[in-house]
């Protein structure tokens, strides 16, 4: 990062404008944020800017979805930080930013990102945690008036997520003769299955109109 970029980042983090417009400020500082995350430089400042800006944006219900030019690169970088950074607080903040960012994304992109996160075997911690992000998106969709254009309330939801979330990984997990109880307990799969069953319970409880066709699509 250049000296001027660092100065811009520090000013944005510690002296934010009280009348900041998130749809103007984010695109202008995006290259600096991306560089900061990629190099692990001034990461606390970058996450603070993103949390504050996205939270402010979330409070303005009339704003449209964020541009993919913003959401796609950040959603590509943040999962690794949220999964493997050495500082637990940084991991938590990165995950919070990812949640806010997905909530501000176009629905189709949010859907695609969640499919990728829940099926990414290279980031097992995120594969578990992202089930909660799917639940968050589903509950948000179910809280809105029925809309045929909401991708989370169509049969595509279980066509896409059913084989990822509602089956063990690997598929022969419980029939394998080589699996021991200790191996199973030490893996990420028990926690992932608990999260998936929690999501399915929410789906059964809240989707009273069978909008995602949950009884016939599995």
Which residues does each predicted region cover?
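Alpha-solenoid helical repeat scaffolds
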Residues: 1-112, 128, 132-136, 141, ...
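Short linear, low-complexity motifs centered on an aromatic residue
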Residues: 110-120
